[in-house]
């Protein structure tokens, strides 16, 4: 069995360099919620040095709240903003002799696109129009995955190690109890259950089926690095190979 292990990077946290030795893919902030040209360049170089697959991590334009503010924007605006951010990172990757492999939206853009078909279509179209060989990463079973499939993009269904799930397979909003799993043991057990058994227990106690093709660990978590090491060790002990 194999699994991709990804992290959201270039967001101003000190653990980026060390996380890049543990993950198989990196989603690099493109300036709309965090990061800038220099952080993008630094992350790209570090990812290439470690053989980590590079992806764009586009967001709503929301630096004040780290891309976590809900927004209602026309699909054409979301298309243009997504294309802009992908292109910015793509130029840096190309200049460094690398190849961009995937796109994963960030924060509220990701969450809204998981449920809003029009928003999901705008993102999928931007990815397709920029480079149809890119993989679109989205919440497992979401509208974003379906939109990617409609555009005949390769898709990768994502699960979260440290987030609580609702009975419908969506993430518990960060404003609600149970949104974040702070206990490492609980996060580890949830991750292994999703990867090995294809199911997750919701905050209401209902078991929900999920397709786990990539696991996200958040680089902004206080214990991100320690948890990443523990998760890699657990995967190794179970002959689960980490690769993009």
From Swiss-Prot:
Give GO MF terms, alphabetically. Answer: 5-oxoprolinase (ATP-hydrolyzing) activity; ATP binding
Q: Which keywords does UniProt give here? A: ATP-binding, Hydrolase, Nucleotide-binding
How does it associate, per the subunit comment?
Forms a complex composed of PxpA, PxpB and PxpC.
For this protein's source organism, the top of the classification is: Bacteria, Pseudomonadati, Pseudomonadota, Gammaproteobacteria, Enterobacterales
- State the protein's purpose: Catalyzes the cleavage of 5-oxoproline to form L-glutamate coupled to the hydrolysis of ATP to ADP and inorganic phosphate.
Name it.
5-oxoprolinase subunit A
Please state what class of enzyme this protein is: hydrolase
Q: Which gene encodes it?
A: pxpA
Matching PANTHER family: 5-OXOPROLINASE SUBUNIT A, UNCHARACTERIZED PROTEIN YBGL-RELATED
Signal peptide positions on this chain: none
Gene3D superfamilies this protein is in?
Answer: Glycoside hydrolase/deacetylase
Pfam families on file: LamB_YcsF
Q: Which InterPro entries match?
A: Glyco_hydro/deAcase_b/a-brl (IPR011330), LamB/YcsF/PxpA-like (IPR005501)
Its EC number(s): 3.5.2.9
What's a single GO BP term from this record?
carbohydrate metabolic process
Q: Which family does it belong to?
A: Belongs to the LamB/PxpA family.
**Catalyzed chemical reaction(s):** 5-oxo-L-proline + ATP + 2 H2O = L-glutamate + ADP + phosphate + H(+)
């Amino acid at each position: 069995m194999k699994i991709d292990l990804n992290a959201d990077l270039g967001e101003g946290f000190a653990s980026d360099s060390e996380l890049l030795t543990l993950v198989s893919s990196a989603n690099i902030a493109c300036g709309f919620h965090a990061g800038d040209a220099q952080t993008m360049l630094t992350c790209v170089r570090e990812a290439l040095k470690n053989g980590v697959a590079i992806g764009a991590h586009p967001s709503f334009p929301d630096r004040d709240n780290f891309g976590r503010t809900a927004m209602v924007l026309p699909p054409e605006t979301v298309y243009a903003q997504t294309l802009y951010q992908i292109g910015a990172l793509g130029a840096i990757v190309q200049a460094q002799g690398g190849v961009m492999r995937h796109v994963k939206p960030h924060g509220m853009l990701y969450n809204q696109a998981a449920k809003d078909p029009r928003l999901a279509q705008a993102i999928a179209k931007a990815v397709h129009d920029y480079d149809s060989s890119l993989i679109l990463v989205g919440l497992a079973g979401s509208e974003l995955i379906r939109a990617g499939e409609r555009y005949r993009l390769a898709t990768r269904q994502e699960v979260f190690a440290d987030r609580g799930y609702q009975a419908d397979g969506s993430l518990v909003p960060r404003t609600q109890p149970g949104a974040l799993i702070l206990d490492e043991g609980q996060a580890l057990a949830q991750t292994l259950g999703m990867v090995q058994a294809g199911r997750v227990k919701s905050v209401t106690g209902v078991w929900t089926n999920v397709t786990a093709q990539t696991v996200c660990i958040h680089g902004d978590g206080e214990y991100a690095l320690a948890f990443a090491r523990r998760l890699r060790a657990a995967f190794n002990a179970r002959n689960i190979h980490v690769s993009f």
